């Protein structure tokens, strides 16, 4: 297996403790019979293409990528990212399958999803669990793993990915009325790093280490990107609104969680009586 690399800005960095095999490598693929069959017949891709016609998925050889992944543990993780950050990437759908029969709470390695302006959701990497999401639409990361973690991922391309409406932010999108649209549009990627500025920073440190050369370079690149966007006063004002909405959403969610805990405690007291 090869060391995994992450694209951040214009450079690529090696992630500690993460290794992978790209099944486009025929010699390696032929050593994994079942994965070779999966890659050659692409039945799952064809089935998804039938079930999701609106995505106009492709099922030809060059449009499908399958990677096997081994996380050694020792804190191995992924920083916040989209699987499709923009042109010329064609990825449309991500399908992750987890292969961890003995996973338990505390082992780490959860997939953490960040639906735009909503509360994050943690997905446990349990054996045979399949997670499917839009490559160009869902911000996510992998939390630090403290035990070996195995999975494979299928990415499927589409020729309609990254249209002009998906990549070009306009003045009409910088208003409250545009928020419902942004929640369901890949255009949210343009604003992602400024809205989730702190989350990006923490995820980089978690992945690359606090004072490593790679983390310093990635943090500097991230900061430069954020500042370049915030130089536009209209963007800066709208981002402040989005951050407030995100904070309020999380505060409301935390209050509901606390309320649920109080109800459970009250129920326990009644049971004890």
What are these language model-derived features?
Residues 34-170, 269-273:
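Catalytic core of non-heme Fe(II) oxygenases with the double-stranded beta-helix
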Residues 184-192, 196:
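Transcription-regulatory cofactor-interaction regions
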Residues 1-52, 169-172, 177, 181, ...:
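Non-heme Fe(II)/2-oxoglutarate
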């Amino acid at each position: 297996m090869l060391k995994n690399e992450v694209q951040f800005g214009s450079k690529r960095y090696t992630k500690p403790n993460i290794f992978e095999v790209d099944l486009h490598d025929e010699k390696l693929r032929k050593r994994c019979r079942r994965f070779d069959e999966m890659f050659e017949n692409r039945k799952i891709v064809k089935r998804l293409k039938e079930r999701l016609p609106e995505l106009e998925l492709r099922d030809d050889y060059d449009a499908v990528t399958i990677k096997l992944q081994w996380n050694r543990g020792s804190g191995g993780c992924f920083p916040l990212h989209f699987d499709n950050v923009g042109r010329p990437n064609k990825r449309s759908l991500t399908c992750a399958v987890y292969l961890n029969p003995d996973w338990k709470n505390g082992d780490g390695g959860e997939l953490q999803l960040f639906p735009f302006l909503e509360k994050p959701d943690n997905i446990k990497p349990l054996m045979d669990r399949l997670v499917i999401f839009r490559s160009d639409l869902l911000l996510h990361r992998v939390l630090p793993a403290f035990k070996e973690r195995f999975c494979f991922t299928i990415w499927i391309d589409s020729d309609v990915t990254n249209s002009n409406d998906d990549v070009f932010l306009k003045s009409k999108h910088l208003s409250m009325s545009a928020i419902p649209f942004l929640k369901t549009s890949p255009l949210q990627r343009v604003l992602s790093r400024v809205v989730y500025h702190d989350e990006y920073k923490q995820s980089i440190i978690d992945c690359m280490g606090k004072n490593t050369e790679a983390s310093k370079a990635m943090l500097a690149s991230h900061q430069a990107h954020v500042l370049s966007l915030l130089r536009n006063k209209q963007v800066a004002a709208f981002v402040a609104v989005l951050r407030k909405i995100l904070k309020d959403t999380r505060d409301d969610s935390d209050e509901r969680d606390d309320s649920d805990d109080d109800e459970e405690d009250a129920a326990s007291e009644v049971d004890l009586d």
